[in-house]
C-alpha cells in the first residue's frame, strides 16, 4: 500500500515509486514531520533531536522537560501561539481577540482514491491510481478542527496536500492565514528557485541562497499573475538539471498566494505554500468550513530537470482535463 500506519509508534509513511514521506504523532499529540525524500524502508524518528535551548518555550504538557520545544521541532501544520516562532501555516483570531490554536491529533482515515475539493481545482485520479490519508487535528479549547488531506499518486511520484478548517466552537473565528503545505528540514544549505516576470517578459528564473530570516514571494493582485509564479523549487546548493536533491511545491490556485522559505536560528529550514495572508480575513461561524487550495509536492534526487518532468507528467494526466482524447487540441487565440 502507498500509505502505511505503524500503530505502536504512531508513524505515517507515504510511499511513491521513488520517494517517501514520513510523519508521526508524538506523546503530546502533536503531528511532527520526520522525512521527505528518496524512498526509505524504516522509521526516521531518530532525526528528532531534543536539547535545552534558551528562549525556546516549552508547552505545559512537557512539565519540567526543557528539551521539548515546538520552536525547534519539525511540524506538519504549525499554528501561531504554541511557542513556535517561525512562520505559521495557520493563524486563527478567536472571538476574544487572542491568536492561538493548539492543534492535537484526534484520528485518521486511509482510503482508496484521491480526495476532492468542492469548488476548487485539484488533481484527479481513479480509485486504483491514488490513495488518500486524512488526519483530523483539533484545538479543544477553541473548537477549531483541521483536516489535513494527503493524496498519494504512487506512479507519478507526487503527493498532494490540502487543509480543511472547520469552526466547531460556539463563537465566530477569523482565519487570518492558511497554508495547504509545510515542509520542515532539520539542516543543510539550500537555495530557492522561483520565477518572476512583467508584461511581455514572464517566467524568468531566479535562484538564490536561503539565508537566515524569511523569504517571501506571492501575489496580492487577486490572481496568481505574471509577477510571480505559484511554483517553487528548493534545492541543495550543488543541484543542477541532472543531479542533486530538489523539492518542489506547486499551488493549484489562480488567486492570491504566498510562498515562504525561512531559515531559523538553529539552521533549520521551513517551506510553506498557501493563501496570501495580506488582504485575507475569512470569518467562520459555528459549523462553517474553509477549504485551502491544494499544493502538489514533488521530490527528485536527480536534479530539477527530472523534478520538472515529473510535474509535467502529473499535471498533463491528472490536472488538465483532456477533452481531445490525447490528440492535439484546437487552436487557441491569445
Segments from the language model and where they lie:
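Hydrophobic faces of well-ordered beta-strands that scaffold small-molecule active sites
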Residues: 21-23, 292, 329-334
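Short Pro-Gly-centered flexible turn/kink motifs
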Residues: 91-93, 98-107, 282-301
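Short, Lys/Arg- and Gly-enriched loop/turn segments at beta-strand edges
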Residues: 298-310
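Short acidic, Pro/Gly- and aromatic-enriched capping/linker segments at domain boundaries
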Residues: 1-12, 265-285
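An acidic-aromatic substrate-binding cleft motif
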Residues: 310-334
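Polysaccharide-binding surfaces and accessory modules of carbohydrate-active proteins
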Residues: 5, 10-13, 17, 21, ...
Amino acid at each position: 500500500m502507498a500509505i502505511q500506519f505503524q500503530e505502536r509508534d504512531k508513524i505515517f509513511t507515504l510511499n511513491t515509486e521513488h520517494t517517501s514521506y514520513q510523519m508521526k504523532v508524538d506523546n503530546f499529540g502533536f503531528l511532527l514531520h520526520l522525512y521527505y525524500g528518496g524512498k526509505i524502508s524504516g522509521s526516521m524518528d531518530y532525526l528528532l533531536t531534543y536539547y535545552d535551548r534558551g528562549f525556546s518555550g516549552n508547552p505545559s504538557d512537557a512539565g519540567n522537560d526543557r528539551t521539548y520545544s515546538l520552536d525547534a521541532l519539525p511540524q506538519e501544520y504549525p499554528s501561531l501561539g504554541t511557542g513556535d516562532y517561525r512562520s505559521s501555516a495557520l493563524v486563527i483570531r478567536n472571538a476574544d481577540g487572542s491568536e492561538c490554536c493548539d492543534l492535537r491529533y484526534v484520528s485518521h482515515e486511509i482510503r482508496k482514491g484521491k480526495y476532492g475539493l468542492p469548488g476548487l481545482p485539484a488533481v484527479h485520479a481513479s480509485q486504483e491510481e491514488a490513495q488518500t490519508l486524512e488526519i483530523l487535528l483539533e484545538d479543544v479549547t477553541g473548537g477549531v478542527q483541521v483536516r489535513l488531506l494527503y493524496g498519494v499518486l504512487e506512479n507519478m511520484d507526487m503527493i498532494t496536500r490540502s487543509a480543511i478548517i472547520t469552526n466547531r466552537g460556539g463563537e465566530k473565528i477569523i482565519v487570518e492565514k492558511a497554508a495547504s503545505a509545510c515542509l520542515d528540514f532539520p539542516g543543510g544549505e539550500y537555495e530557492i528557485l522561483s520565477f518572476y516576470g512583467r508584461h511581455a517578459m514572464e517566467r524568468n528564473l531566479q535562484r538564490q541562497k536561503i539565508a537566515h530570516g524569511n523569504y517571501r514571494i506571492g501575489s496580492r493582485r487577486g490572481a496568481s499573475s505574471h509577477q510571480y509564479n505559484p511554483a517553487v523549487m528548493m534545492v541543495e546548493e550543488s543541484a543542477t538539471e541532472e543531479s542533486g536533491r530538489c523539492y518542489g511545491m506547486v499551488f493549484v490556485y489562480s488567486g492570491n498566494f504566498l510562498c515562504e522559505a525561512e531559515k531559523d536560528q538553529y539552521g533549520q529550514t521551513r517551506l510553506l505554500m498557501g493563501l496570501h495572508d495580506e488582504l485575507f480575513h475569512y470569518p467562520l461561524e459555528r459549523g462553517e468550513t474553509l477549504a485551502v487550495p491544494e499544493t502538489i509536492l514533488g521530490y527528485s534526487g536527480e536534479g530539477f530537470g527530472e523534478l520538472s518532468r515529473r510535474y509535467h507528467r502529473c499535471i498533463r494526466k491528472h490536472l488538465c482535463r483532456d477533452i481531445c482524447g490525447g490528440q492535439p487540441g484546437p487552436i487557441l487565440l491569445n
